[in-house]
Amino acid sequence: MVVSVLALCGLMVLAACSKKEEQPSNTMAEQQAQPAPAATPIDPATVATVNGTVKFDGTAPKPAKIDMSQDPGCKGTNEAENIIVSGGDLANVFVYVKDGLGNRTFDAPKDPIVLDQKGCQYHPHVLGVMAGQTVQIKNDDPTTHNIHPTPKDNREWNESQPPSSPAIEKNFAREEIMLPVKCNQHPWMKMYVNVVKSPFYAVTDKTGKYEIKGLPPGDYTIAFVHEKLGEQDQKVTVAAKETKTVDQSFKAGGE
């Protein structure tokens, strides 16, 4: 009789402990189920613009020729895109608001950013995307490619894409600048994804120009980042409805 009572008491204690252990899991589930904070509204009547030109100071290196003969599906000539300069203007510089937005939050666009593979090159060579936004990857070549991001702060993945296959859709959850992407099938194929938390970014075109629209008035740090030449930062203050020009230059060696 005594043994039965003790056994019953032991079961009651175990049941009570189990209930206590379950409580943190329920609390955690409730926290995970909470919706993301709403995007911070911006008054469109007050937004400002920052634009400018990025220059290369010095003698630009000649683009290296790429030998693509290992794959008959890669036709034509190809040149390295690590430093593209035309008339002193520097292309493929990622420009973004690095600091000054405070605790503002922004919704990722629903429309995807397209990354294409054509002529056994990635297009574009430098791409900007918001965290959580879809990147749609296409293959317009008559050969198989292998898309392989090698991030520091995001999840690494490696996926083959045969010709004429459906687009691959991916996203990156964390902010990361100059995230390298390569193709395991074609070692010369390289590009860079830039993942940011706000829509305030741009990539310089072949004339070195960029434009960032829709900024709320304030004090900001604008970062200019190049895959080989490094990063340059500038402070800028924009008033309501103001358009401010912020130019930048890079020297060989990232000076």
PLM feature spans:
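Sec-dependent bacterial lipoprotein signal peptides
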Residues: 1-15
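Extracytoplasmic copper-binding redox domains, predominantly the cupredoxin/blue-copper superfamily
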Residues: 17-255
